[in-house]
Amino acid sequence: MRISITALCLLFIAGSCTETTKSPVDWLIDGSGYVSSVKETDNRLIMTNGLISRTFSLSPDGATIGFSNIIKGTELLRSVKPEAIVTINGYPMKIGGLTGQPVSNYLTDEWISLMKPDTISPFVLTAHKTGEILPRFDWKKRLEWMPKDLPWPPRGKSVDFTFSARKYISVSEGLEVTVHYEIYDGIPLICKWISVVNNTGHEIIINSFISEILAFTEAESAVGDKNNWILPDIYVETDYAFGGSMSSESCFEKSVWWVPDPDYKTIVNYNRIQPSLLECRPVTGPSERVSPGGSFSSFRTWILVNDSSNRERNGLAQRKMYRTIAPWITENPVFMHLRNADTASIKNAVDQCIETGFEKIILSFGSGFNIEDTSISNLNRFKELTDYAHRRGITLGGYSLLASRKIGGGHDVVMPPGRQPVFGNSPCLGSSWGEEYFRKLYRFIKYTGFDNFEHDGSYPGDVCASNMHPGHLGYEDSQWKQFRVITDFYKWCRGRGVYLTVPDWYFLNGSSKTGMGYRESNWSLPRRQQEIIERQNIFDGTWEKTPSMGWMHVPLVEYQGGGSEATIEPLKEHLPHYGQRLADLFGAGVQAAWRGNRLYDAPETLELVKKWVSFYKKHRTILDADIIHVRRPDGKDIDAILHADPANEEKGLLMIYNPLDHPVRKDLKVNIYYTGLSKFAVISENDKPGHRYRIDRNYEIILPVNIEANGESWYIIK
């Protein structure tokens, strides 16, 4: 019997490349040939890397006049818009742009040559410069937790366009707006943000801004209205993301908006409500006050251009984006969630971590650990315990709950009428309690040397209408100010090498891990059911996340009920199940919060844990690589995932699980395109001697498999 896995597309990159980026290779297999460059010609500036290009006019004013998908040979831009719109002291001001385009359906070079600057705009392009990409913030790398070293900052080029006030326009006199761009090597990705410098001699208020405005070609034409429109084939993400969803969609309708284009009079949609205009702006505020001589920076927007409609391929592109602009997500320590924070339990956990190969301990919720206790006795105690762990090569950290708490005393968020906090309750980070809370976090981590931190709830984006809190003035600036408080803390942690697990989408601000995506009450189900559901969670959670970006949860002790049927303790009495959980997780390269008081309780338990930790560390580079989704677990047949890394000696690792009570023997057809192999593959099962297989024209091999009942096998592909 054969199972056919859908052949993955894009076997050859078509389209022209620049002189410095000629490469016939798929950029997802090898992007090294696609090097960023910036060129000026005929009053135009072109940023390109051979995969995409963005073209700007330099005269008569600065504007985006082209955005090309070179891979597919298509133009994405249909109309010229301002580079940005900034409202200062209540006055909306366009930054750059050109006017005079006859229709908004498409854009020609002839029209561009006849277009004029927007005379309503109080700014004009006065300077531009190119350079190398600078780091957004410091990152102290933990190479011992990474499969391979990655560059920081990412490689690529930057361009800054400076717009100054036009003469005789008083509203913008003394203001300077810079539009910043970055393009990255080896990936069709561009970043943009704006900054404002106040040289007016008086305080200004940045009421609002739109930092990206792009009129993309619509993905479909429909005369009638629709509930769900197909959007242009790009992926947009900002570093202004929150909401507790543990999904990249945290940006949408918080900082990323698809809206109708009021200038698009000739669109097919009769009511002209089709979203064909991308705007990147905060949902409220920022209402930021900028002192004389001060400056303001917006959030950053990244646009990733897709070259396919294939879900796996677009997911691989998104995962490569995170490795490029947030490479700390590749840190993937093996960790334990310790349920008791007394000294004896912590030292015992450290010793067990050494024996098993675990690398990190988090003092779990309900353990008795309280990071807000900054008494000198508590600080000294945890400094001694941290030093004890560090001397043995183990890192120590703890858990803290932020959102969903009710503080009282005027310190909670004051919501506008008819609105509730995301989690029902939440303190305001700008209240005096909030300011003291973060002072305690900084002090505790600095004093004790803690090098990992789990921040539950985080900041979900709740606004606050109070005008009595010291950290914000009122409703309009409350979200922006609170977000800055928490992201400043996360960036500080990242610079110190403090590993962050945060159940929200804070990756671009320093977080390394969020929830993979699971229902906590499922860990109270019978053990056998947990095994398959666990693998389903991993399969579903790794379309947009790398294995290292999502944590799973394994309650070694009873968790939210379920009794003895759901519980792994005593560990030695449930070795087959414990072993299956270890195989599920380490075989996927996914770390779990192993929550309990110990990792082993007998020599045979210790050997089982050591077996799978050693397996993970031996194959860490390939197990931390992207997952190709082969067959989703359903309890009816084998399920499988394929790790692929064409740059590694081990090009692939195929994990196959058999949930059935009888062996499964069959020929499995597997597409190994993303391993980078094209003619032959040497495949070895469970570290046995390998066999040579021919790869067909669809990049598939036929692999005979024989998986024992309730077992698993792994296959190394070279």
Can you annotate each of these PLM segments?
Residues 326, 342, 380-387, 391, ...:
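Active-site-adjacent "subsite" loops/lids of carbohydrate-active enzymes
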Residues 45, 49-52, 486-690, 702-706, ...:
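Active-site-proximal substrate-binding groove within the catalytic cores of carbohydrate-active enzymes
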Residues 25-26, 100-411, 435, 590-636, ...:
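Conserved structural scaffold segments of CAZyme catalytic domains across common CAZy folds
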Residues 12-24:
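Bacterial Sec-dependent signal peptides at the C-terminal "C-region" and cleavage site
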Residues 268-279, 678-702:
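Solvent-exposed beta-strand/loop surfaces of large extracellular or lumenal domains
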Residues 382-394, 478-498:
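Alpha-helix-loop-beta-strand connector modules within alpha/beta enzyme cores
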Residues 364-372, 376, 410-420, 454-479, ...:
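Active-site-proximal loop/short-helix segments
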Residues 4-13:
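Sec-dependent N-terminal signal peptides
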